Structure formats: C-alpha cells, structure tokens
C-alpha cells in the first residue's frame, strides 16, 4: 500500500471532535428568567476560561502628553495604566463643532497592522483624512460624526511590542505570538489582557467631564473586533458593541482557518460557540458587519451565527437591539450600517 492512497486529512480528526461536542452552556433558555440565569453562568465560566479578571481596578495614573489641533477635531495623546507595569497608549479625539456638552463616546480598537495609527490616519508620521486600508480610519470617521473617540493601542502592536519588533523597522510586525504563548504558560490569555486594557480605557473615560457615561460604545475590526466582542460580553458599562470582520462561528473561523494565536481561549468550545457569547451582550446593543469575500471569517458562517444571536436577543425581548450588515468587500471595515445604527442607539 502506498501512502498516497491513505487519507491523511488532519482536519477530519478535529472536525469530528467538534461534531461530537456537547457544549455545557449552549443557549437553551425557554423564557427570560432562564435566559438571565444562563447569562450569569456563562459569564462566570468565560471569566474563568480567559484567566480571570482583577477584582480591583488598577490606579490609572493617567497623563495627557500632547494636544494637537486638526481643524475639525483635537487629538490628545494619552497614557494610563491597566495593570502593574502595563501602560496603555491612546489617542482621544474630540469634535470641535460641539461645545459645552457631554458626548457619546466610541472606544475604537484596531486589528492587526501598525497599531492605533491605522484608525487615526497616521502614516509615515503624517496624519491623513482619506479612508483607505482595511481600517478606513474609522476613529476619524467617528469623530467627524460627533462622537468623542478613545482609540487605544492593543498590547502587542505598534508602540506596545517587544524590543526586537520595535527594532525591526517593520511597523506591521506584531508580538502577538510570543505574548499570547506567554499568557498561556501563565494560565491566562491575550484576550484577558486586552479586555483588561479596554476596561481600563472605560475607567479612564469615567474620569472625564466631557463623556456621557450612559452612551458608551465600542467598535473594533478583526483582532479589534475580538477585543470589542469579549469586552462587551464582560463589561456592562458598554451600551453598544460594533463588531466588524470577526463575528462568525469558532468552528468556521479560528477552528478551521489559520489565525493569530491571540484569538484563542483554551476550552471555550466545551461550553459555548461564538453566538452564545453574543448573548452575554443582550439586551444591550450589538451590531455586526461582515464582508462577502472575507477569507478568514467566512460570510456564510457569519450569517448562521447572526441567526443564532438574533434568536437569543429575541429571548430577551431585545430583538431591536441587534442588527447587522453584509457588504461587498474583503476583510475590511465598512461602517455604513454601523454608524446609522449607532445614531439611533446612542
């Protein structure tokens, strides 16, 4: 017998494992009381799986390094602490055409690329206003629509990389693999660390007098969608989550397609699929967008997950709090439906 006659398709093994799973916390509630009880159980389990969350918030030690004027908005360069020896870099964009009132705020979280620069239009140290690249400078789009915007740099990207990546001259390189592996060795996850950064960002927003704390949204693309999704599931201060280029099923995305290790939570499929976790956001707002030709988060699986999430939202009598857009494109941000939904929701 020759080896070419033998089926060595390794994904047959892993997919068979998936098909035989019986997730303990798949949504099956028959009424709103059962749904609320289910939420508590899944939220507690999710916190355990990512490696826990701090019981006490870190002192922020925030500082504003610089304030710049860009005509229609100002940009503050900000630092704050999210954990011991963990400093977060961020930009805060404020619209100049709205004065003397508390504003709704969008926490903007970038995906893989050059870091926070990708959402605030910085390229080669020059700030632009054209909306190109996969991120389409969505933080600038948001401030132009009258939102206060806090755009944070995710751990492992941009300025927050290991020294070898900072010295490499490649602005798009990331330290995700090393740092995510380190997290696993410590019994934690990159998702935990990035969610904690995002929660600290909201802590920072709570210190500002120009923020309407009842109108906080989070918006993220790709790996930023990951952080936005899990932060919204775990932090009820967020009224609206806008998830771009991420919402799908685990099975059809990170389970079967090669992805950055920063996406993974060991053991999550023993308890829930991605659409179940969307139910932790209910009845708060959730808007998801997906491109027709996204190669790493397949749109057909996204449509399936959307239907599942919609059913969960309806169980909370919150069907109007969930919406979505499928648009023509690749793995990229659109925002057309998202900003329209945000205007009606915030």
Q: What is the predicted role of each segment?
A:
Residues 178, 182-185, 200, 239-278, ...:
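Mobile cap/lid helix-loop segments that gate and shape the active-site cleft of serine hydrolases
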Residues 67-127:
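Glycine-rich active-site/cofactor-binding loop and its immediate structural neighborhood
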Residues 210-222:
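Alpha/beta-hydrolase fold nucleophile elbow
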Residues 307-346:
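C-terminal catalytic histidine-bearing segment of alpha/beta-hydrolase fold enzymes
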Residues 1-74, 82:
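N-terminal targeting or regulatory segments adjacent to alpha/beta-hydrolase or S9 domains
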Residues 281, 288-290:
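Short beta-strand/loop motif that positions the catalytic acidic residue
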Residues 292-297, 332-333:
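Acidic catalytic loop of the alpha/beta-hydrolase fold
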Residues 101, 108-196, 206-207, 252-257:
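Cap/lid segment of the alpha/beta-hydrolase catalytic domain
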């Amino acid at each position: 017998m020759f080896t070419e006659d033998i089926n060595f398709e390794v994904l047959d093994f892993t997919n068979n494992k998936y098909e035989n799973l019986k997730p303990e916390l798949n949504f099956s509630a028959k009424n709103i009381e059962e749904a609320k009880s289910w939420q508590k159980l899944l939220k507690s389990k999710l916190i355990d799986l990512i490696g826990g969350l701090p019981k006490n918030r870190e002192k922020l030690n925030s500082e504003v390094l610089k304030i710049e004027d860009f005509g229609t908005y100002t940009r503050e360069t900000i630092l704050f602490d999210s954990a011991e020896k963990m400093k977060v870099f961020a930009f805060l964009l404020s619209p100049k055409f709205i004065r003397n009132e508390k504003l709704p705020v969008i926490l903007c979280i970038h995906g893989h690329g050059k870091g926070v620069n990708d959402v605030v239009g910085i390229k080669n140290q020059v700030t632009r206003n054209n909306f190109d690249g996969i991120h389409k400078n969505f933080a600038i789009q948001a401030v132009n629509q009258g939102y206060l915007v806090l755009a944070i740099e995710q751990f492992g990207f941009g300025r927050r990389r290991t020294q070898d990546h900072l010295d490499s001259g490649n602005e798009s390189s990331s330290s995700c693999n090393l740092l995510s592996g380190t997290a696993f060795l410590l019994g934690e996850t990159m998702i935990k660390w990035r969610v904690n950064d995002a929660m600290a960002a909201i802590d920072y927003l709570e210190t500002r007098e120009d923020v309407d704390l009842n109108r906080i949204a989070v918006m993220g693309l790709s790996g930023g969608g990951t952080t936005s999704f899990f932060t919204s599931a775990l932090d009820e201060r967020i009224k609206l989550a806008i998830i771009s280029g991420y919402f799908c099923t685990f099975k059809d995305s990170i389970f079967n397609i090669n992805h950055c290790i920063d996406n993974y939570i060991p053991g999550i499929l023993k308890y829930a699929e991605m659409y179940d976790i969307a139910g932790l956001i209910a009845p708060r707002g959730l808007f998801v967008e997906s491109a027709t030709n996204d190669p790493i988060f397949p749109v057909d699986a996204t449509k399936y997950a959307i239907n599942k999430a919609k059913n969960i939202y309806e169980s909370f009598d919150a069907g109007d709090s969930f919406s979505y857009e499928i648009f023509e494109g690749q793995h990229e941000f659109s925002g057309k439906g998202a900003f329209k939904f945000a205007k009606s929701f915030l």
